[in-house]
Swiss-Prot record:
UniProt xrefs under InterPro entries: Ribosomal_bS21, Ribosomal_bS21_CS, Ribosomal_bS21_sf
GO terms, molecular function: structural constituent of ribosome
Entry keywords, A to Z: Ribonucleoprotein, Ribosomal protein
Family classification: Belongs to the bacterial ribosomal protein bS21 family.
PROSITE patterns, sorted: RIBOSOMAL_S21
Gene: rpsU
Gene Ontology CC annotations of this record: ribonucleoprotein complex; ribosome
Protein name: Small ribosomal subunit protein bS21
Stretches the record annotates as Disordered: 40-59
Pfam family name, one: Ribosomal_S21
Gene Ontology biological process: translation
């Protein structure tokens, strides 16, 4: 669980930015996006190999 301490006088925008930054760092949003819809194992496997090829081409 992510907690962001807000001091007296801090703006809500600053607190929201800090929360978003912490969630991105922990990978929460990425996992929510990945589990939003069911994807078949074959599609996961295909995406994984495609990412590996992309990474290999960069190196």
């Amino acid at each position: 669980m992510s907690l962001v301490k807000v001091r007296i006088g801090d703006s809500i925008d600053k607190a929201l930015r800090a929360l978003k930054k912490r969630l991105d760092k922990e990978g929460v949003m990425k996992s929510v996006k990945a589990h939003r819809f069911y994807s078949k194992p074959s599609i996961k496997k295909r995406a994984k190999s495609k990412a590996a090829l992309k990474y290999k081409k960069q190196r």
